[in-house]
């Protein structure tokens, strides 16, 4: 990609004199009437049906519109504001539904019996059947997004506050939309501003993350924690007394601004009495130990983390982020320079013997947004997967842990988001290698050495995949055969041939024994063994007669399914990594970089060169990601129902060790709710289950047949239309190979995800 304006010599002064260009691009509404205005060929309009597919494929490929990094950067930056606006509108809709159509107040008053609902179906031709009795004289659709639990954690106590949030979110959306227009048309940043990476890190880490976390800690301290303390006392039947009046119900709750009054707040947390500033600056920080705690474990009333622990966490994290954000050299000439760090960083001479170390890596990252995006997607995707585990192991929101459909939904959601982001990381890494990588800059540095060693990397990874696949699947096949032959003693199981996950059990014991041994002297902490998370040999957390979380025992069944996880993860990695390492060239197609990110084959006359583009690796990686994560969420769903929630009689350990057990005791047995949902409030999940299966099956039509079949069929259909003088002016064309695979993958994933959605929700909502 060309870089405009031309690169200048590195500036001595770190601060840019004028970082923006005013009135750079005038607003031109006429473009809205010209689909494909960015491309000469697309702007001519459609001659064949391929035009509409190319329009969709290239609409957001800003690189190809102008081929100018500054213009691309401005478009991406402006699009960020549009994205934020969409998020605020979406949040506003959630707040509005909570304020106008929900049973939020009813749920707050009895969260262990009333189920959350925020949508009432209108009775047109019988749809009112979907309005389930959720308790508290409310009929509606049960929601499983966790927003009620989250709002309770924020300290929201009535629908009026939700309506205020809905209006506020709409206003923020309007500001964001204006920001996107302003920073593209009126005050567009220059390329040097985008490439000023140290200032960007300072702004993002210290400003957005650090100050944002401290600001949220302030909300938690002054609103969230006092509200939680009052409401927890109500739910426990031991109301607190404020100014001589017992706070016995939500109607008695002080308004949020009243909680900021030290005279009221100090009756809940004495540390919030009027001397907080003095205590802070005299370092008398122990005075804050009643609302900045380190208790560990779960609140026995709500089955969630202590709000005072959460406040402490956000404050500490925010302070660390503010400090970390100031590590980089910006305007004062002190701190780290990323270019100096990378240019001077050479790895271990034995393990990583690249003579030029990381030289050239800074320039690659500073000029390739695809490379940066690849790294960021990989990290945020991994973080999402970590979050999915924390949602059940350390539930952050009140009463979340006993809302089983929501726990399962949040786990599944964050797993799929993480998987999609990681595949996206490989996609953008491949694009970066093709469009932004300059071999002349990378000579004997770490990236060059990895590319030179790619055959060894991929072949070894392929061996690991084969080893994991044959052995882990072989354990299941062995068990199926032994069970069929009536030889349980010869099966791999906790009662037969044991394969205990000794390392995982050791890690559980470390977490259990380490609690309480790493605390500060004099701190107000009460960490007991098992209270880092109850899943690590802790105790059972029960709320309202339901198990929120309990110790999760690991045995042979977990050992076996975890090696299936290892297998699917390694195969996904093999596909994605091969797509990146062989994006520019391969023995089969040495000039692959000239063909671009996505291409069907290496031209006519070269058989066997189809489906080798970097895009095709992303396509294949999506399937393995989806199938791998399906095993993960199935494992989680069955394990929790069996060993934690007590819904399936603890059958996981003995049933999940055979393929037949997964088919019979998980898929078949647990689909009874969705298959028999007709005539019940969960009947829409039955329809969704059928419909999503259809969408999934529809995808196979695109994936299993070639382009020529359809083009041949179209020729006959067009001939018939010509006979009747009904031929269309836009010539029908079969989808290209790449387009067909894209449509197939989209329907495969959509159908599979919606099928699983219906299966999980009907199961746990149906069980009540």
UniProtKB/Swiss-Prot annotation:
One of its GO terms (biological process) is photosynthesis. Its main location: membrane. The chain crosses the membrane at residues 76-99, 162-185, 201-225, 310-328, 369-392, 408-434, 456-478, 559-577, 617-638, 682-704, 742-762. It is a multi-pass membrane protein. It catalyses: reduced [plastocyanin] + hnu + oxidized [2Fe-2S]-[ferredoxin] = oxidized [plastocyanin] + reduced [2Fe-2S]-[ferredoxin]. One of its GO terms (cellular component) is plasma membrane-derived thylakoid membrane. It comes from the Bacteria. [4Fe-4S] cluster binds at residues 601, 610. Pfam families: PsaA_PsaB (PF00223). One of its GO terms (molecular function) is oxidoreductase activity. SUPFAM superfamilies: Photosystem I subunits PsaA/PsaB. Gene3D superfamilies: Photosystem I PsaA/PsaB. Divinylchlorophyll a' binds at residue 693. Phylloquinone binds at residue 710. It is found in: Cellular thylakoid membrane. InterPro entries: PSI_PsaA, PSI_PsaA/B, PSI_PsaA/B_CS, PSI_PsaA/B_sf. Keywords: 4Fe-4S, Chlorophyll, Chromophore, Electron transport, Iron, Iron-sulfur, Magnesium, Membrane, Metal-binding, Oxidoreductase, Photosynthesis, Photosystem I, Thylakoid, Transmembrane, Transmembrane helix, Transport. Its EC number is 1.97.1.12. PROSITE patterns: PHOTOSYSTEM_I_PSAAB. Divinyl chlorophyll a binds at residues 701, 709. Belongs to the PsaA/PsaB family. PsaA and PsaB bind P700, the primary electron donor of photosystem I (PSI), as well as the electron acceptors A0, A1 and FX. PSI is a plastocyanin/cytochrome c6-ferredoxin oxidoreductase, converting photonic excitation into a charge separation, which transfers an electron from the donor P700 chlorophyll pair to the spectroscopically characterized acceptors A0, A1, FX, FA and FB in turn. Oxidized P700 is reduced on the lumenal side of the thylakoid membrane by plastocyanin or cytochrome c6. The PsaA/B heterodimer binds the P700 divinyl chlorophyll special pair and subsequent electron acceptors. PSI consists of a core antenna complex that captures photons, and an electron transfer chain that converts photonic excitation into a charge separation. The cyanobacterial PSI reaction center is composed of one copy each of PsaA,B,C,D,E,F,I,J,K,L,M and X, and forms trimeric complexes. This is Photosystem I P700 chlorophyll a apoprotein A1. It comes from Prochlorococcus marinus (strain NATL1A).
């Amino acid at each position: 990609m060309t870089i405009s304006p031309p690169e200048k010599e590195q500036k001595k002064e770190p601060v840019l004199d004028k970082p923006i260009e005013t009135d750079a691009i005038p607003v031109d509404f006429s473009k809205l009437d010209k689909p494909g205005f960015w491309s000469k060929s697309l702007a001519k309009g459609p001659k064949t049906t391929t035009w509409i597919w190319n329009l969709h494929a290239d609409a957001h490929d800003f690189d190809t519109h102008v081929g100018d990094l500054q213009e691309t950067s401005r478009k991406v930056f402006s699009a960020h504001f549009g994205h934020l606006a969409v998020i605020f509108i979406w949040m506003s809709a959630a707040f509005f539904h909570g304020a106008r159509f929900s049973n939020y107040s009813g749920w707050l008053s009895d969260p262990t019996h009333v189920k959350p609902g925020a949508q009432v179906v209108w009775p047109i031709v019988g749809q009112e059947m979907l309005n389930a009795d959720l308790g508290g004289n409310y009929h509606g659709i049960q929601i499983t997004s966790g927003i009620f639990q989250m709002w309770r954690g924020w300290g929201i106590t009535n629908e009026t506050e939700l309506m205020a949030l809905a209006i506020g979110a709409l206003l923020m959306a309007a500001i964001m939309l204006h920001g996107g227009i302003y920073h593209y048309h009126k005050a567009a940043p220059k390329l040097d501003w985008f490439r000023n990476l140290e200032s960007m890190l300072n702004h993002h880490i210290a400003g957005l993350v650090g100050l944002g976390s401290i600001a949220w800690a302030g909300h938690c301290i002054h609103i969230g924690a006092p509200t939680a303390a009052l409401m927890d006392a109500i739910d426990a039947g031991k109301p607190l007394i404020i100014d001589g009046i017992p706070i016995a119900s939500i109607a008695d709750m002080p308004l949020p601004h009243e909680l900021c009054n030290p005279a009221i707040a100090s009756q809940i947390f004495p540390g919030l009495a009027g001397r907080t500033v003095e205590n802070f600056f005299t370092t008398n920080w122990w005075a804050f130990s009643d609302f900045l705690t380190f208790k560990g474990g779960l609140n026995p009333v709500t089955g969630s983390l202590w709000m005072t622990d959460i406040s402490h966490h956000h404050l500490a994290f925010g302070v660390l982020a503010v400090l970390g954000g100031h590590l980089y050299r910006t305007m004062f000439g002190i701190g780290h320079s990323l270019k100096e760090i990378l240019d001077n960083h050479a790895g271990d001479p034995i393990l990583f013997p690249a003579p030029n170390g990381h030289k050239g890596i800074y320039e690659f990252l500073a000029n390739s947004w695809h490379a940066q995006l690849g790294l960021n997607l990989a990290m945020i995707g991994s973080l999402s997967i970590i979050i999915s585990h924390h949602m059940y192991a350390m539930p952050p929101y009140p009463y979340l842990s006993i809302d089983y459909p929501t726990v399962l939904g949040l786990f599944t959601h964050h797993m799929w988001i993480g998987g999609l982001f990681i595949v996206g990381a490989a996609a953008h890494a491949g694009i970066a290698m093709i469009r932004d990588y300059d071999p002349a800059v990378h000579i004997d540095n770490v990236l060059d050495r990895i590319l030179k060693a790619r055959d060894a990397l991929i072949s070894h990874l392929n061996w690991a995949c084969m080893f994991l696949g044959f052995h882990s699947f072989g354990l299941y096949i062995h068990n199926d055969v032994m069970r069929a032959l009536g030889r349980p003693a010869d099966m791999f199981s906790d009662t037969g041939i044991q394969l205990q996950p000794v390392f995982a059990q050791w890690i559980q014991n470390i977490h259990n024994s380490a609690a309480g041994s790493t605390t500060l002297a004099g701190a107000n902490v009460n960490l007991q063994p098992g209270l880092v998370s109850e899943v690590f040999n802790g105790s059972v957390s029960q709320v309202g007669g339901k198990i929120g979380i309990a110790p999760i025992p690991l045995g042979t069944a977990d050992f076996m399914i975890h090696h299936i996880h290892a297998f699917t993860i390694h195969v996904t990695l093999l596909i994605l990594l091969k797509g990146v390492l062989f994006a520019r060239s391969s023995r089969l197609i040495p000039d692959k970089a000239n063909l671009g990110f996505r291409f069907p084959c290496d031209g006519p006359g070269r058989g066997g060169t189809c489906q080798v583009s970097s895009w095709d690796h992303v396509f294949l990686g999506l399937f393995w990601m989806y199938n791998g994560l399906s095993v993960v969420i199935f494992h989680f769903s069955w394990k929790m129902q069996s060993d934690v929630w007590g819904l399936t009689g603890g059958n996981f350990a003995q049933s999940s060790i055979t393929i037949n057990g997964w088919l019979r005791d998980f898929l078949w047995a647990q689909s009874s709710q969705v298959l028999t949902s007709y005539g019940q409030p969960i009947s829409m999940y039955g329809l969704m289950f059928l419909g999503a299966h259809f969408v999934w099956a529809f995808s196979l039509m695109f994936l299993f047949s070639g382009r020529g079949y359809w083009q041949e069929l179209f020729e006959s259909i067009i001939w018939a239309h010509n006979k009747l003088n009904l031929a269309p002016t836009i010539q029908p064309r079969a989808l290209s190979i790449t387009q067909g695979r894209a449509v197939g993958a989209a329907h495969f994933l959509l159908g599979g995800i919606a099928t699983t959605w219906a299966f999980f929700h009907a199961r746990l909502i149906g069980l009540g």
